[in-house]
Swiss-Prot record:
Active-site residues per Swiss-Prot or TrEMBL entry: C387
Identification of the protein by name: Ribosomal RNA small subunit methyltransferase B
Keywords, sorted A to Z: Cytoplasm, Methyltransferase, Ribosome biogenesis, RNA-binding, rRNA processing, S-adenosyl-L-methionine, Transferase
EC number: 2.1.1.176
Top-tier EC class: transferase
Compartments where found: Cytoplasm
Length: 446
């Protein structure tokens, strides 16, 4: 890695929050790493009270990156490349603070300038100070120049895909550029949704009910430690539209159910909330991510069979089950996808994903669908789900599957959809939830 960048995982001393933010942003932009991996790996390097600021800066920079980049172009004569890229990322941090946080300007500038020392880039101290102070002096004029055109804050390839698919593409882009609300899923084995809402109110936490029977929307986000009985499994944090997975699967006690691509386990635990006596198999190809599944099961006081395996190769992992000639009553396939429906929550997706990724994802989805169909019982249910808004991963994928598999029948869903549509597409413009797609398939008996 570059001279000025510490390996985040090997840091052993506390660094400035701004320095760590710059390192994280550099790794997102130049190495394709995700915030969901980098921030947990670095949070031990900041004071507990500074963690929200670290998250705000990193997610915020990724959310409005093109605007910040345009501003830097106006302020820096020569692009900061190579070993100086970390300084460029530090300027992104500084500009974000000045534009989008309530930190006093003088304090924000001082902290960012001081971060050059932590990054062993002290000789750029004057440049950083000069650029940020010039921005403060010329802010009004600069922003008029930068904002004279409507900016999507999305990569062009994704905007073009959205334009092709949706007449209201601008609304989708606009929704993606806003912070999402915090949604809770109430464990119906412990409390009704209304009862838990009362418990929240007693703690001074306001919440609204939704069409989804398990969901509550917090008017203001809070730390999970503030949620009543969170560590006892009374509630989980999960988007309202993601919560439909277990509800549409409609598991029943005594059934053998596969949660494919299960990590981090939110859907696994919801299935067990709906059917506590079901035998649930949680499968994921990444062993490290299965740790989260175990943690969630422990918090919810539930049991499931957790297996590391490739969903495209059932024969390799079915042997780990005690049942012989295994076939599942129900399968939830939350397929690997572009995650273009959850950009509000993960704005780095805009810069991590490339147009060329989509065809590979579509091919993988097709392969997994076909493989898992072979281990579904006759008359069994497979629920296909993605957190994508791209038709080729969703309706077009299922249309092709139905064409190729005469024993597959599309089941109705309890949503009002466009006549003739295949499955149902939630958009981030609709109900305060993320973009999700669902299609419910039954294996018909010939």
């Amino acid at each position: 890695m570059q001279k000025f960048v510490k390996n985040v995982k090997k840091q052993t001393v506390l660094l400035s929050t701004r320095a760590i933010a710059a390192q994280i942003i550099l790794q997102v932009l130049d190495q394709g790493k995700s915030l969901s991996t980098l921030i947990p790996d670095t949070q031990h390097q900041v004071k507990t009270q500074d963690l929200p600021l670290l998250q705000e800066i990193c997610f915020g920079v990724c959310r409005v990156l093109p605007r910040l980049e345009l501003i830097i172009k106006q302020l820096v004569d020569k692009p900061l490349k190579g070993k100086t890229r970390i300084v460029h990322c530090l300027l992104l941090v500084g500009l974000y603070q000045l534009l989008y946080t309530r930190i006093p300007a003088h304090a924000a500038v001082d902290e960012v300038v001081n971060a050059t020392t932590a990054l062993k880039a002290e000789h750029f101290r004057g440049l950083v100070n000069g650029v940020l102070r010039r921005f403060l002096r010329e802010q009004e004029t600069l922003l008029v120049k930068v904002d004279k055109h409507w900016h999507t804050l999305h990569p062009d390839w994704l905007v073009n895909r959205l334009k092709e698919a949706y007449p209201n593409w601008r609304e989708i882009v606009e929704a993606n550029n806003h912070k999402p609300p915090m949604w809770l899923r109430v464990n119906q084995q412990k409390n009704s949704t209304e009862t838990y809402r009362t418990l929240l109110a007693e703690q001074g936490i306001e919440a609204e009910k939704a069409d989804n029977p398990c969901a509550l929307r917090l008017l203001q986000p809070v730390a999970v430690s503030q949620l009543p009985a969170f560590h006892e499994g009374a509630v989980s944090v999960q988007d309202v539209n993601a919560q439909w997975s277990a509800l549409l699967l409609a598991p029943e006690n005594g059934e053998l159910i596969l949660d494919a691509c299960a990590a981090p386990g939110g859907k696994t635990t919801h299935i067990l909330e709906q059917a506590p006596q079901a035998h649930v198999v949680a499968l994921d190809v990444e062993a490290t991510r299965l740790k989260r599944v175990h943690e969630n099961l422990a918090r919810m006081q539930q049991q499931a069979t957790v297996i590391c395996g490739d969903a495209t190769q059932p024969a390799q992992w079915l042997k780990q089950l005690s049942e012989s000639a295994v076939q599942f009553d129900r399968i939830l396939l939350d397929a690997p996808c572009s995650a273009t429906g959850v950009i509000r929550r993960h704005p780095d997706i805009k810069w991590l994903r490339q147009a060329s990724d989509i065809s590979a994802l579509v091919a993988l989805q097709k392969q997994i669908l076909q493989a898992l169909w072979t281990v579904l019982k006759p008359n069994g249910i497979l629920l296909y789900a993605t957190c994508s808004v791209l038709p080729e991963e969703n309706a077009l994928q299922i249309e092709q599957f139905l064409t190729n598999n005469v024993d597959a029948k599309l089941e109705p869903l309890p949503f009002t959809a466009v006549e003739g549509s295949v499955g149902y597409q939630f958009l981030p413009t609709e109900n305060g939830g993320d973009g999700f797609y669902y299609a419910k398939l039954r294996k018909v008996v010939s």
